[in-house]
Design a protein with these regions (language model features):
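Membrane-proximal helix-turn-helix segments that form the acceptor-binding/catalytic region
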Residues: 122, 150-168, 183
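Nucleotide-activated donor-binding/catalytic signature segment of Leloir-type glycosyltransferases, i.e.
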Residues: 257-278
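Carbohydrate-associated surface elements
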Residues: 58, 175, 195
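Short alpha-helical donor nucleotide-sugar binding micro-motif in glycosyltransferases
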Residues: 98, 274-275, 282-287
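Conserved acidic donor-binding segment of nucleotide-sugar-dependent glycosyltransferases
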Residues: 318, 328-339, 348-353
Length: 393
C-alpha cells in the first residue's frame, strides 16, 4: 500500500492507495441493485486512485479475473430466472487476483466468495463482506413467503456457512444491521448506505407528448415476486382517477409476462421498459409520483434516486423492508400488500398537488445525508479498519 500526498489550499492530506479485490458473482448486469452498487463503488474507488481487481463472471477487461459459471442443476437454473449466477471458484485465477492485495471485499454469501476468503486468509490478506441478501429473497422466490421459520433457518444457515468467518460486515441500512444482531452475527457491522450518485438531482424535464395530461406513477426495480408490482397495478385500477393514470414499470424480471397480463385491465397500458442511468434521471424528473411496493428490501437505491430528484415516494410499510426509513411522514407510507390503501394514497396526492410540491422540497433536502462520495469514504474507512486491525495482530 503506497501513500500519496494531495495538496488542497495549502493543506496536505495523505491518501492511502490500496490494491482492493472486489468479489461478486455477477457484475455486468444493471437490473440488480446490488450489482449496480458494486459497479458504482468500483468506479469511485478507481477515480480515487486505488487499483481495483474484480473476481467475477462476464466479459474480460482490465483488472478483471473472469470465472466460469455453473450452468447445470436446479439451483443455477432457478437463480438464472432471477438474474443471478454462481461462479465456479478456480484457485489459480483467484490466486493471481490476490497477489499483492491489501484488502478483499466480498459481496455475496456464495461459494466463490467463501473460497476467496479462505485463500485470502491463508495469505494474510484482511477480508470484509456485505449483507445485501435477505432470507426472504429465498423464501419469496421459493413460493414460501409466509414461512417465518424458514426465513430464520436461512439466516442461521448462512451465518454458519459464511458470515461467521468475517469480522467486518457492510450493512446498507440500520434495518439490515438489526437483522444480523437478531440472529447473533458477531462481526462488527458498518451501516453504510449505498448512496445516491450526484447525477440524480432535480432538473426541468417536460413530459413527452404521449404523457402530457396524465398523472405518471413510476416504480423502478426487478419484476419479481418480492417487489410487489402486482399491488401497484391493482392500486392503479382501484384509483378514482384510473383513467388519468399512466403507470411506468422500469425493469425486467421473471414476473414480466404475468404483470403484462395483469395490467391489461387498466385504461392506459402500462409502460414496461429498461432504462439507462441518464434516461432514469429524466424519468424521475418527468413523473408525478414514485411508488415502492416491495415487501423485501435491504435499502432500495431506486427509491433514493427518485426522492433525490424531488419525486415524492409512497412506500410499503413492510416489516421486512428497510425502505420505509425514507418516509418523512405517514403520507408516504401505505399498508404493505394492500392495493386499496395504496390507491387511497395515490388519490390523495392527485388531489393535493400543492402539498406534494412542498414535500418534494423536503425530500430533496433529506437526500443530502446519502451523499455518494461520503458513503464511499465510509467504505474506505471500513477497509482501513480491517487493514489496521490485521497489522496489529
Amino acid at each position: 500500500m503506497t501513500i500519496v500526498e494531495l495538496s488542497f489550499q495549502k493543506t496536505v492530506y495523505q491518501l492511502q492507495i490500496m490494491i482492493i479485490v472486489i468479489v461478486t458473482d455477477l457484475y455486468n448486469s444493471t437490473n440488480n441493485g446490488t450489482t449496480v452498487s458494486a459497479r458504482r463503488l468500483v468506479e469511485a474507488l478507481e477515480e480515487r486512485g486505488h487499483e481495483v481487481r474484480l473476481i467475477c463472471s462476464g466479459t474480460e477487461g482490465k483488472n478483471r479475473y473472469i470465472l466460469p459459471t455453473y450452468q447445470h442443476g436446479l439451483i443455477p437454473k432457478v437463480a438464472s430466472w432471477n438474474g443471478m449466477v454462481f461462479c465456479k471458484p478456480i484457485d489459480s485465477i483467484i490466486a493471481k487476483a490476490l497477489e499483492g492485495a491489501d484488502i478483499v471485499h466480498c459481496y455475496m454469501p456464495f461459494p466463490l466468495e467463501k473460497r476467496v476468503m479462505q485463500m485470502a486468509k491463508e495469505k494474510g490478506i484482511p477480508c470484509t463482506t456485505a449483507m445485501h441478501v435477505q432470507a426472504q429473497h429465498v423464501t419469496y422466490n421459493a413460493g414460501m413467503s409466509g414461512c417465518n421459520l424458514l426465513s430464520s433457518w436461512v439466516y442461521v444457515w448462512i451465518r454458519q456457512y459464511y458470515y461467521q468467518y468475517f469480522d467486518y460486515i457492510h450493512c446498507p441500512s440500520q434495518f439490515m444491521a438489526d437483522e444480523l444482531e437478531r440472529y447473533h452475527y458477531k462481526a462488527k457491522k458498518y451501516v453504510i448506505s449505498n448512496g445516491i450518485c450526484p447525477i440524480f438531482k432535480p432538473k426541468e424535464v417536460s413530459k413527452i407528448p404521449s404523457l402530457k395530461g396524465k398523472f405518471c406513477i413510476l416504480m423502478v426495480g426487478r419484476l419479481s415476486k418480492e417487489k410487489r408490482q402486482d399491488v401497484l397495478i391493482k392500486a392503479c385500477s382501484l384509483s378514482k382517477y384510473a383513467s388519468n393514470i399512466q403507470l411506468i414499470l422500469a425493469g425486467h424480471g421473471p414476473k414480466e409476462e404475468k404483470y403484462h397480463k395483469l395490467s391489461q385491465s387498466l385504461p392506459n397500458p402500462v409502460i414496461f421498459g429498461f432504462y439507462s442511468q441518464s434516461d432514469l434521471v429524466n424519468l424521475y424528473n418527468m413523473c408525478d409520483l414514485y411508488v415502492h411496493a416491495a415487501d423485501v428490501e435491504s435499502e432500495a437505491i431506486s427509491c433514493m434516486e427518485a426522492f433525490a430528484c424531488g419525486l415524492v415516494p409512497v412506500i410499503a410499510n413492510s416489516p421486512i423492508s428497510a425502505t420505509k426509513q425514507f418516509a418523512l411522514d405517514e403520507r408516504s407510507l401505505f399498508k404493505h400488500g394492500d392495493a386499496q390503501d395504496l390507491a387511497d394514497h395515490i388519490d390523495y396526492w392527485i388531489e393535493h398537488p400543492e402539498e406534494k410540491k412542498e414535500l418534494s422540497k423536503k425530500y430533496i433536502e433529506s437526500s443530502a445525508k446519502y451523499d455518494f462520495d461520503h458513503c464511499v469514504d465510509m467504505m474506505i474507512g471500513m477497509f482501513n479498519d480491517a487493514i489496521a486491525d490485521k497489522a496489529n495482530v
